[in-house]
Amino acid sequence: MKNKLFDIWKQEKASINAWLSIPNSFTAEAFGKMGWDSVTVDMQHGQNDYSSSIAMIQALSNSNTVPMTRVPWNEPGIIMKMLDLGVQGIIAPMINTKDDCEKFVSYCYYPPIGQRSFGPMRAQVVYGSDYYQHANKNIVSLAMIETKQAVENLDEIL
């Protein structure tokens, strides 16, 4: 398991991400083949739920595109389920405080870094039985700073 976004960012280059708001696995598959660095399945404002996201993430797995998800909320259950499904990046909305951000990050990573529980059924199928050993180094966690409160707390959040 290797997340190519980290290689792109180490070279101080920009990565190009596509956004999927409508639940359609064919569209996800097509976007995966178009050369995007990553594709995000939007579960917050898009029409995607967990069930529709499964097929979309499966379709993206047949490409060199990094599958990502914007979750509906900073909640451990859906974050961990999406990571177990095999996404390599989570975007969390409404991160307003340092505490919000610390909780979010902890949900994305296995101990000792975080508190993610172990259950990567599909992720192990896609990335191998040693997924657990490499996951923490290959998961992107992006916090959305989108409110006045978050901007006021930005230094503390970072």
Go through each PLM region and give its residues:
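Expand to "…catalyze enediolate/carbanion chemistry for C-C bond making/breaking, isomerization
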Residues: 1-158
